[in-house]
Amino acid sequence: MKLEYRYSIILALLLLAQMLMACTDNAKNTEIALVSDNTVNIGYGGGEELVKFICYDKWTISSDVSWITFDSPTEGNGNAIIKIRVEKNTSGEDRMGKLSIACGGNIEIIEIKQSVKTIDIGHKHPSILYTREELLNIKRMVEANSSASVTTTYNNLMTRCNNALNYTAAPYTGQDPTKFIEESYIPGSNSRDLALAYWFTQDKKYARKSVEIIETWAKACRDISYVADAGSAMYLTRGMYPMVCAYDMLVTEDVMSDETKKNITDWFHVLYREGMISINLWESNDYFNKQYYQNHLVAHSMGILMLGLATDNDELIQFAIDSPANPRDVYELLSGCIFMDGDTPCSREKAGSASPVKGEIYDRYRHDTGPLKGLQYTHLTLTLLSTTARMCYNNGLDLFAYTAPTGENLRYCFEYYSDFYRTMDSCIKSGYYCGETERMTKAGDNPGMYEMGLRYYPDSEPVRQLISSGTFNRESSYMDLLGYTRFLSAEIND
């Protein structure tokens, strides 16, 4: 799955290895210089992988299993980039095959380890932001006026949507991911909100406008390759999520043609292409100065997961949630991003800082490196983790109830950080975030996101105290990523 995005790096490494070997021995060298790892992990879906080595003699390569085949010559001389093809694993258990590389009298072994499918998702639309059942429940609540706050939120939504009917999409067609997300906020929010308006009113004018916005962006942007930097896939994921949600809400509603669906999903596949580039870029650069579990990495798997759900692709879903081929899959992110008492923080934190406690989030180090952005970035990480968990929950995998082998659970994060937004005091608890009070809620860290905490942890006293504190207006609380946050907890009708 990593094939096409590493070619230039691979060739450079091969040339470097060749130069080093030539400098150390002018005679024929029959040692094998591996550029590939000795062990290669492949997801259950299989696919293509590159094996790289240098040999200054004739060489051969072979496999000891039938499920690994070669798309390249199996013998040659000198530099070698061998494309192997691994079949989907339908055996029901993890398996391993061995590649044997013979060069002169030397042999090197590469182990190919392939996992089994562990994630069974019940595909349904909609499910990425809301399920059909949730949408119909909100519609019933509005019609019955059974919740004043939900009704007021609905009225706010419809005001936005009626204005959005006059909106004309103007897609950003440059290659800068930062500008992409900036330009996507309004069209993304409009498309998602209009899709909601369609569900609540059944008036197709809202659906048609939503689809028009998405398809305009799809046609303009589907062939763009973005500048590969540390933020590329993160910005694309966050920018595209609302439009993916809108598509998910409308794809089964007889409001778009097959051609339109193809135009849109062809564009959505940028999430995989750019996601894989970013995953590889972060891994090969030691996570850009040892930022091992932070919001960018959550966004990488979140983007591939939402693409998999939008297109009913089990292999992408498995890769995002639980795959040895993904160095930061969702399960690893849950255990890595969430601290337990005594965990080792990011090495970029200042020496002598208060030790992390249960429920804190790895991105807190932004208090030191931001500076004074610890609460902003822990909120972002929690938002992305929770949005990812909600997608899984809506498709039958409850990650809100999941506790990692080392004890981490999303509930701890909601409960730890809710007190900061209830008191609006960054100096409480350990004092680590002291100095951030003036910035709280001003950089996207909307307390309304805790409606998601209320939805999945309705018995949590800290979360309930925040929701009822009056710190934020529940009816008007709005996030570019999620829209009106009150709808997220509509089932908890207090």
PLM region spans:
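Surface-exposed binding patches on compact interaction domains or structured appendages
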Residues: 54-83
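Bacterial N-terminal signal peptides that target proteins for export
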Residues: 1-10
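Flexible internal linker/loop segments at domain or repeat junctions
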Residues: 334-370
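Extracellular glycan-targeting catalytic surfaces
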Residues: 118-290, 298, 302, 321-328, ...
